[in-house]
Regions:
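Flexible "arm" and connector segments at domain edges
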Residues: 1-91
Length: 91
């Protein structure tokens, strides 16, 4: 399951919407130097994911509007995409 690195994704020519989204996440990682600032530490990233899952759970259990729930879901999706980039796993 060899995936692309941040550099690979930044220089890659996307062929579909998924690859466009992956490239945007990689560009964000590159811009903020995640690899150099411990942003690819998976322990840290998993803790962020747990936090985001808690926010989604709270939005759902409190009956928040669907757009707020969707925002929390998007946060989790973006984090998971970033996990795959940090771990160089092809989704």
């Amino acid at each position: 399951m060899d995936g692309k690195s941040v550099t690979d994704w930044v220089s890659h020519e996307p062929i579909d919407e998924w690859e466009v989204m992956m490239q945007k996440v990689a560009q964000f990682h590159h811009k903020h130097n995640f690899a150099g600032k411990n942003g690819h530490d998976m322990g840290y990233r998993i803790a962020l994911t747990v936090e985001e899952l808690g926010e989604l759970s709270a939005a759902i259990t409190k009956g928040k509007p669907l757009d707020e729930c969707a925002e929390e879901m998007a946060d989790i999706l973006i984090l998971l995409m970033g996990h795959s980039i940090a771990m160089k796993v092809d989704l």
